[in-house]
Amino acid sequence: MGVEKVPKYDIPTKKVDYVFIELDKMKPHEQLVQKELEAFIESVTGSGIFWKPMLLAKVPGEDMYLIVDGHHRWAGLQKLGAKRAPSVILDYFSDDVKVYTWYPAFKGDLNEVVERLKKEGLEVIEDPEAEEKAERGEIAFALVGEKSFAIPGGLEEQKKVSKVLDEMSVEGKIELIYYGLKEDAREDMAKGEIDYVFIRKAPTKEEVMELVKRGEVYSPKTTRHVLPFNPDKIDVKLEELF
């Protein structure tokens, strides 16, 4: 899926109470990455222990929960036939819970990437104002490096970009890195460690909730949630989840 460059935050690890929530009461907001799903299933069946609780938030007006963190744990448990998972319920609209986005970047041949994007039916248009347009949510992505390109569209176009980058990374055609901060991507670009970065507008919490209410999902790694704490490890036997 690519390497993550996570900003350094001083977030405490905290022992928190968890409750068991039925898996069919949970709603995803992002597409899955097959490799991550397989890795979770291998890990949890190998150890027989579920150690990282789901992080959920109540969907307003519904008896359902938004998956804030834990998409692959949720899908993996479902695949194994489990019925529930230990979960920490967050106050999603609290100021302590932040939502940002990830910025996919690559080292590789720009022309090859552009060609693959166009094969997916995407437009890639040179545009010096692409970054500003992306930040305002007027286009799917800005592709920024030595030159600047606009990729028009919305959610569906973002999914196509994600698919192309994932495939090219698996094929070894590009080195794919996800940045939590644009500034870090620019620093690495100046050092020659990456060639281009894709920039998009981060979704708001309201947009995330509206999306799940419609039964839709973002492309993988669209949201980057930052919480006031990291939940401490738990020790729940896998067999207890069936």
Curated annotation (Swiss-Prot):
It is an enzyme of class 2 (transferase). The active site is at E30. One of its GO terms (molecular function) is ATP binding. Pfam families: ParBc, SerK_C. Its EC number is 2.7.1.226. InterPro entries: ParB/Sulfiredoxin_dom, ParB/Sulfiredoxin_sf, SerK/SbnI_C, SerK_C. Mg(2+) binds at D69. It comes from the Archaea. Pathway: Amino-acid biosynthesis; L-cysteine biosynthesis; L-cysteine from L-serine: step 1/2. Keywords: ATP-binding, Kinase, Magnesium, Metal-binding, Nucleotide-binding, Transferase. Disruption phenotype: Disruption of gene does not lead to complete Cys auxotrophy, but mutant displays a growth defect in an amino acid medium depleted of Cys. Its cofactor is Mg(2+). GO terms for biological process: cysteine biosynthetic process. It catalyses: L-serine + ADP = O-phospho-L-serine + AMP + H(+). SMART domains: ParB. Coiled coil: none annotated. O-phospho-L-serine binds at V68, G70, H71, H72, W102, K221, T223, H225. ADP binds at S43, I49, W51, K52, D69, G70, H71, H72, R73. Belongs to the SerK family. Free serine kinase that uses ADP to phosphorylate L-serine to yield O-phospho-L-serine and AMP. This is ADP-dependent L-serine kinase SerK. It comes from Thermococcus kodakarensis (strain ATCC BAA-918 / JCM 12380 / KOD1) (Pyrococcus kodakaraensis (strain KOD1)). The gene is serK.
